[in-house]
UniProtKB/Swiss-Prot annotation:
Name of the featured protein: Zinc finger protein 800
GO terms under cellular component: nucleus
Regions that span the bilayer: none
Record lineage: Eukaryota, Metazoa, Chordata, Craniata, Vertebrata
Disulfide bonds: none
Gene Ontology BP term (one): endocrine pancreas development
Linked residues for Glycyl lysine isopeptide (Lys-Gly) (interchain with G-Cter in SUMO2): K132, K279, K392, K409, K476, K599
Listed SUPFAM superfamilies: beta-beta-alpha zinc fingers
A GO MF label: zinc ion binding
Coiled-coil ranges per UniProt: none
Function: May be involved in transcriptional regulation.
Phosphoserine: modified positions: S317, S336, S422, S426, S455, S457, S460, S462
Amino acid sequence: MPLRDKYCQTDHHHHGCCEPVYILEPGDPPLLQQPLQTSKSGIQQIIECFRSGTKQLKHILLKDVDTIFECKLCRSLFRGLPNLITHKKFYCPPSLQMDDNLPDVNDKQSQAINDLLEAIYPSVDKREYIIKLEPIETNQNAVFQYISRTDNPIEVTESSSTPEQTEVQIQETSTEQSKTVPVTDTEVETVEPPPVEIVTDEVAPTSDEQPQESQADLETSDNSDFGHQLICCLCRKEFNSRRGVRRHIRKVHKKKMEELKKYIETRKNPNQSSKGRSKNVLVPLSRSCPVCCKSFATKANVRRHFDEVHRGLRRDSITPDIATKPGQPLFLDSISPKKSFKTRKQKSSSKAEYNLTACKCLLCKRKYSSQIMLKRHMQIVHKITLSGTNSKREKGPNNTANSSEIKVKVEPADSVESSPPSITHSPQNELKGTNHSNEKKNTPAAQKNKVKQDSESPKSTSPSAAGGQQKTRKPKLSAGFDFKQLYCKLCKRQFTSKQNLTKHIELHTDGNNIYVKFYKCPLCTYETRRKRDVIRHITVVHKKSSRYLGKITASLEIRAIKKPIDFVLNKVAKRGPSRDEAKHSDSKHDGTSNSPSKKYEVADVGIEVKVTKNFSLHRCNKCGKAFAKKTYLEHHKKTHKANASNSPEGNKTKGRSTRSKALV
């Protein structure tokens, strides 16, 4: 193996002529040269570089260079300053005996050292600190250290120090104090604030030791508790900052500002090191998400994360306690969710919240580039749904109050009769067997309810528009949602609480109408309820690349069509009667039943396929749906013919068709 060696400044330069077997690597050119003499050398040269050098030179000296100290008497080298000091103390005492007094201000060497420290660690604050040392009775090798500012002597902070720490600090203040190991008298010294250590060593006293302070003093001590855990005495919850625990007590426990200090308990952090520094850097609670505890750099990033990720929760009233309890509503006021939901909408409609023409939100003073972005912001952040007719809000406040009441009104579970669900194109819309059977039982009651509503419809056309809207609102809610079963018939979703169903209804409401959102394929007439179905359809049927999908995906939301609930229910009613007439021949009503046959569910389930590389689908020319097997496609085409020739007369003459015959 060839020898890889670099030249040294003092070595004799062999050029490899005597040793042809080994190849020497050419050395670093500065190491081959003799040292250049400059006007200043040693520490003076470094000080001059920090005083008048470039930014790059300062960076090299601070970050990329290690210092080796050389004793001028014995030429010994030391990599650390403490080793050099110990060496000079015991083996090579300095040539000039220094007295114990402070150095003269006019001394050039001390002035140069001060300039060096000022250049490396520029002091932002010139405030002085007072250090008080108190002896410990049980331990003679350590003292209590109290640090306070001269401008505010009330704020006294306490930290314990190790013997090495106390020795260094006492040597700086006076040499006589360092010779006595047990400290008997308390001494007060005025020192300059160190750059980092004092800030991290500061810890706040407990609530018993600290006197009552003003609100300004409370705000200044927000970030001084990095080494301690703050505990709420009422619920024993831990916090990292005083601001977080004060906000928690004020919002959750409803305590006044004057009583906050009584409910805060301070406990030392167990993972704190011996010098008082915390091992883990604690992120302030105000910059972390209260739901998922993810930390961010700024509060604006926390708000943006909360609006986009946790969009179902209210940002202004959310707290970690309420967010983690599953059954408790997210409102801080102790009122029912239905009432609070209603009052919130009424309160929001009492004044102008937005300006559609200027695309500006008047609640948080934000301006947006388009009305779509403003509507999205109002729906996600403020939970206000805007429609095209909502721009008249500012002109007629009375009408807005009525319309908001109509929009929010939820019928009680006792008075609402449930009706069967509606079926759309989405293949995930198949029902569980229990839900399907339950809703088949409720079908006659729902149709009786429909007959009653039809008989009352002439009365609903009264001169007052608000009353008419209220009358027509009830059947729409009951047609799309089952408040007894807590079930959305449009999405086939079951909810655990009435509040969750109420929040879900907001997603289906636009002004005074209930709609169902459909995503449409931009290349054909295919449309579905789910966005991922459109993406799958474009990939499998139209054979488009992922690059094309990246362009199309953003516009799918804009192309989405909001169809009213009547359109969805009527569409299912057209598809269903031919099957329901055969199955329920004893029913007295004509084909208005919305419950479909299981045959159509099976046909829709057949379109869900697993795509592989060696795979070809059978596509329908009429609607663009693709099927894995040809039998599924032929069966699907029969449904098109059945829908085209669907009439009451044809249904009577037609025989009963079963699933086994259809699939043969």
